[in-house]
Curated annotation (Swiss-Prot):
Gene source species: Clostridium botulinum (strain Alaska E43 / Type E3)
Top-rank taxon: Bacteria
Name of the molecule in the record: Probable 2-phosphosulfolactate phosphatase
Listed HAMAP family: ComB
Cofactor: Mg(2+)
InterPro entries named in the record: ComB-like, ComB-like_sf
UniProt KW Hydrolase keyword: yes
Keyword annotations of the record: Hydrolase, Magnesium
Entry-linked SUPFAM superfamilies: ComB-like
Name of the coding gene: comB
Entries under Pfam families matching the protein: 2-ph_phosp
Reaction(s) the record says it catalyses: (2R)-O-phospho-3-sulfolactate + H2O = (2R)-3-sulfolactate + phosphate
UniProt-listed NCBIfam families: PRK00886.1-4 (NF002055)
EC numbers for this chain: 3.1.3.71
Coiled coil location: none
Length: 238
């Protein structure tokens, strides 16, 4: 069992993810949104690359069945029902609904991971549940950090480290690449999370948009026991 880490969506190639269990992380905030929505009874989440595609697909549904969610540059998209705040995806809003979603980084990363054997959605809020499931799979793993506009993102990296750290507590003989070892070490040295992620560029962007409550929620550790999986068409509860 080997664990590798990809530092942003720009570095995803078919040969890296092919036949691997792929774990996609966009902690601030797409994968936190998806995990929250699925946990709150959302029937499925369907990710799209573009706003136009999302709006076009929405026409195929009855308006009472579907919710449009997402962002561009961390801001709600005009004409959409919800932004990319996980706090908006309450049980009252999403239960039994289909969420059509497009985001700047997260949905792009998901689309590029399609050659993977399985595609798991992870965030800080469900990290332990994901780690447990990965150990059950006992396959080679690639943790994909969505990153920010193609660049490395500190928040995704420490989240991956938390997952690796949790796995190592149960299975010590996992083979780690240098970059996955470093991810684990970063988490080991920064278990309070906030003092680390506050140095991240995306954290500053969120603070400037007054998204402090989203930050507080997204850095909570393993408060959700659900593992969403993407089958190339839709994201559902595993």
């Amino acid at each position: 069992m080997k664990v590798d880490v990809i530092i942003s969506a720009d570095y995803i190639t078919d040969d890296i993810v092919k036949d691997k269990v792929v774990v996609v992380i966009d902690m601030f905030r797409a994968t936190s949104v998806i995990t929250t929505a699925i946990n709150n009874g959302c029937q499925k989440v369907i990710p799209y690359l573009t706003v136009e595609e999302t709006l076009e697909e929405a026409k195929k549904y009855d308006k009472s069945e579907v919710i449009l969610g997402g962002e561009r540059r961390a801001v709600k998209i005009e004409g959409f029902d919800l932004s990319n705040s996980p706090l908006e995806y309450t049980e009252k809003v999403v239960k039994n609904k289909t969420v059509l979603m497009t985001t700047t980084n997260g949905t792009r990363a998901l689309t590029k991971c399609l050659p993977g054997k399985k595609i798991i959605i992870a965030a800080m809020i469900n990290a332990e549940a994901v780690a447990k499931k990965l150990l059950e799979f006992n396959d080679d793993i690639v943790i994909v950090n969505a990153g920010t506009n193609g660049e490395f993102s500190m928040d995704d990296y420490i989240c991956g480290g938390y997952i690796i750290n949790t796995m190592l507590k149960e299975k010590s003989n996992i083979e780690l690449t240098d970059i996955s070892k470093t991810s684990n070490m970063i988490y080991e040295s920064n278990k309070d999370i906030i003092n680390y992620v506050k140095e991240a560029r995306h954290y500053s962007v969120m603070r400037s948009l007054k998204l402090d409550n989203d930050i507080k929620y997204c850095i909570k550790k393993s408060i959700v026991d659900v593992v969403p999986i993407y089958d190339g068409d839709k994201i559902i509860k595993l």
